[in-house]
Amino acid sequence: MEDIVKQEKIILTVIMIVEDLVQDWELNLDEAISQETFLVNDLNFSSVDIIQLCVALEQNYERKLEFHELLMEDGKYVGDLSIQQISIFLESKLKNQ
């Protein structure tokens, strides 16, 4: 139960930070940002926006989180990430705190 609460808190934190980043963008979203939302496909994130998100998350959690492990797969950058994928990554990194 505690793990579920922690995971939900991480998801809400990621959503809050993403919403803060896109608040001035003129997005016509069909649905609210959720764990199923993809950064590039749904929110039109650029690579710079993804870097800003990573920095904001590191500042929020007050530690380096080695996002290169999430952003690269088989030596290539991933094409897109969902809020859920980011949250799962964060949960695995924060377990050792």
Question: What is each model feature region?
Answer:
Residues E2-F45, D49-V55, Q59, R63-Q97:
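Phosphopantetheine-dependent thiolation modules in NRPS/PKS and related acyl-activating systems
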